[in-house]
């Protein structure tokens, strides 16, 4: 289980028991800058994900050692070959920025875990880089803990996501709207190759760099395409794009079933792996509202709940634009193929959403009545705005003594007639999610040095399908009116 660290654990492991690879840094020097983390005055390991450390093949006790903490801050070069800041571009709220990059982040390198999967180890809040654009490159403890908490909850919910290995406090005081304790969050992902990475490659290196990046991403994320298409050519890259579309469609469909609002779906926050990244302004809805917006910087609702599939389709169109020269033997052929493929995203998403909602309702996705039941369910959700998590878990535990939720009285008998699989529903619909009011309370207390609420919430949301005795308060939505004024912030 992921827990705050115990300072009494042994710390006498000076030698790094592993070595990181530097595949991305070595293959793409034109997209990276060698860098190191900034020195920190009083670093302390605040939270360590022991299970993830073991999956990576790293001894948790070594990570607790002084050498391990230095590694987690980007200061210990021993296990690494080359730490780098990555360059990328991006559309931010629809506006193209040609040079973004890791303004407060470092890629330490890649490591192959005990499961055989190659993953990045990446820092956030480790100090200024060449991409900082005047910012201080640091992160506050609260946002670092939010990323740890929510990303691990998403993993437990079965959502493709980056994960968090650790949070290290730095001993610095950093200025935001007020003075806050500084921290570094250590993120783990199957890669950090973004739509924005391809945009950057396209404008800085043209077709050759775009092809190399696509081949790297294919080898890393979709290796079966290498076997199917051993030679570079339009079919290889078209199938790569289709795979990315499917991965993103499945991810956003799961967001929509769970009531998750990402909040900042820029192209630099869209990974070709399909993993969810960047939890700064995210939120889980209590009441179902298709117009739900929580991010303080999303003033026009571009990334509201109901827009998320549309925005990801738009982001994927931007990816397709960078790959047009690879899609066909002529420019016109590349454009035609790109448009043809992009036009399929809506159907890919709708199929993924149908499968997700069918699973959530315990229904056979292929049964003739399922589509109608799902359509009626969504219409009732829009009309009555029930608490998303409570409603779905209530259905999962249905019995003859259950009282139909308000507005669902006529729908329930139709649903029961389809013989829903309640056992599988209980493995699909969580008891606990990181509800906004609980997250805010836990983070506020942890920043003040009181860790009990954070530890309790972390334990519940990383085992979300198991009801725990005496934890009823963690199942309930926030106070009346809380969501009407609640706002999230990027933490930058």
Swiss-Prot record:
Q: What is its EC number?
A: 2.7.7.-, 2.7.7.108
Molecular-function GO term, any one: magnesium ion binding
Indicate which residues the UniProt annotation says bind ATP: 101, 103-104, 124, 136-137, 187, 194, 278
The record's active-site residues are: 268
Family designation: Belongs to the SELO family.
Q: Which Pfam families match?
A: SelO (PF02696)
What does this protein's UniProt record list under function? Nucleotidyltransferase involved in the post-translational modification of proteins. It can catalyze the addition of adenosine monophosphate (AMP) or uridine monophosphate (UMP) to a protein, resulting in modifications known as AMPylation and UMPylation.
Stored InterPro entries:
SelO (IPR003846)
Encoding gene, per UniProt annotation: ydiU
Do the record's keywords include Nucleotide-binding? yes
What name is this protein filed under? Protein nucleotidyltransferase YdiU
Q: Which cofactor does it need?
A: Mg(2+); Mn(2+)
> Reaction catalysed by this chain?
L-seryl-[protein] + ATP = 3-O-(5'-adenylyl)-L-seryl-[protein] + diphosphate; L-threonyl-[protein] + ATP = 3-O-(5'-adenylyl)-L-threonyl-[protein] + diphosphate; L-tyrosyl-[protein] + ATP = O-(5'-adenylyl)-L-tyrosyl-[protein] + diphosphate; L-histidyl-[protein] + UTP = N(tele)-(5'-uridylyl)-L-histidyl-[protein] + diphosphate
Organism from which the protein derives: Corynebacterium efficiens (strain DSM 44549 / YS-314 / AJ 12310 / JCM 11189 / NBRC 100395)
**Keyword field:** ATP-binding, Magnesium, Manganese, Metal-binding, Nucleotide-binding, Nucleotidyltransferase, Transferase
Q: Which residues make up the binding site for Mg(2+)?
A: 269, 278
């Amino acid at each position: 289980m992921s827990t705050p660290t115990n300072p009494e654990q042994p710390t006498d492991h000076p030698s790094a028991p592993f070595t990181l690879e530097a595949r991305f840094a070595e293959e793409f020097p034109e997209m990276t800058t060698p860098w190191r983390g900034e020195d920190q005055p009083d670093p302390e390991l605040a939270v360590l994900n022991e299970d993830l450390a073991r999956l990576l093949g790293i001894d948790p006790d070594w990570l607790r050692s002084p050498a391990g903490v230095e590694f987690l801050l980007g200061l210990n070069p021993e296990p690494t070959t080359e730490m780098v800041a990555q360059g990328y571009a991006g559309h931010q709220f629809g506006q193209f920025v040609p040079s973004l990059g890791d303004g407060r982040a470092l890629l330490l390198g890649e490591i192959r875990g005990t499961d055989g999967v190659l993953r990045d180890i990446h820092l956030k809040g480790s100090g200024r880089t060449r991409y900082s654009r005047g910012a201080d490159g640091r992160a506050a403890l609260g946002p670092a803990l939010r990323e740890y908490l929510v990303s691990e909850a998403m993993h437990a919910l079965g959502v493709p996501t980056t994960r968090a290995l650790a949070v290290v406090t730095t001993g610095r005081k950093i200025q935001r709207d007020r003075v806050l304790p500084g921290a570094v969050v250590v993120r783990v992902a199957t890669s950090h190759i973004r739509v924005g990475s391809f945009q950057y490659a396209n404008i800085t290196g043209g077709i050759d760099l775009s092809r190399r990046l696509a081949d790297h991403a294919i080898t890393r994320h979709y290796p079966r395409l290498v076997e199917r298409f051993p030679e570079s050519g339009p079919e290889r890259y078209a199938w790569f794009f289709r795979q990315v579309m499917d991965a993103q469609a499945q991810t956003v469909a799961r967001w929509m079933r769970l009531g998750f609002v990402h909040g900042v779906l820029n192209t630099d926050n869209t990974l070709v792996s399909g993993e969810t990244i960047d939890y700064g302004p995210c939120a889980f809805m209590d009441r179902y509202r298709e117009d739900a917006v929580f991010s303080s910087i999303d003033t026009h609702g571009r990334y509201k709940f109901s827009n998320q599939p549309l925005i990801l389709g738009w982001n994927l169109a931007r990816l397709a634009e960078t790959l047009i020269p690879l899609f066909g033997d002529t420019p016109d052929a590349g454009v035609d193929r790109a448009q043809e493929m992009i036009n399929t995203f809506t159907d890919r998403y709708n199929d993924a959403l149908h499968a997700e909602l069918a699973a959530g309702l315990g229904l056979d996705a292929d049964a003739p009545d399922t589509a109608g039941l799902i359509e009626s369910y969504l219409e009732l959700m829009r009309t009555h705005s029930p608490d998303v998590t409570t409603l779905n878990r209530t259905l999962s535990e249905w019995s003859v003594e259950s009282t139909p939720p308000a507005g669902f009285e006529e729908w329930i008998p139709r649903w029961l007639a389809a013989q829903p699989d309640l056992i599988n529903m209980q493995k699909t619909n969580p008891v606990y999610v990181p509800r906004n009011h609980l997250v805010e309370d836990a983070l506020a207390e942890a920043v003040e040095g009181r860790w009990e609420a954070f530890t309790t919430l972390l334990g519940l949301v990383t085992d979300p399908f198991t009801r725990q005795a005496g934890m009823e308060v963690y199942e309930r939505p926030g106070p009346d009116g809380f969501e009407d004024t609640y706002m999230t912030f990027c933490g930058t």
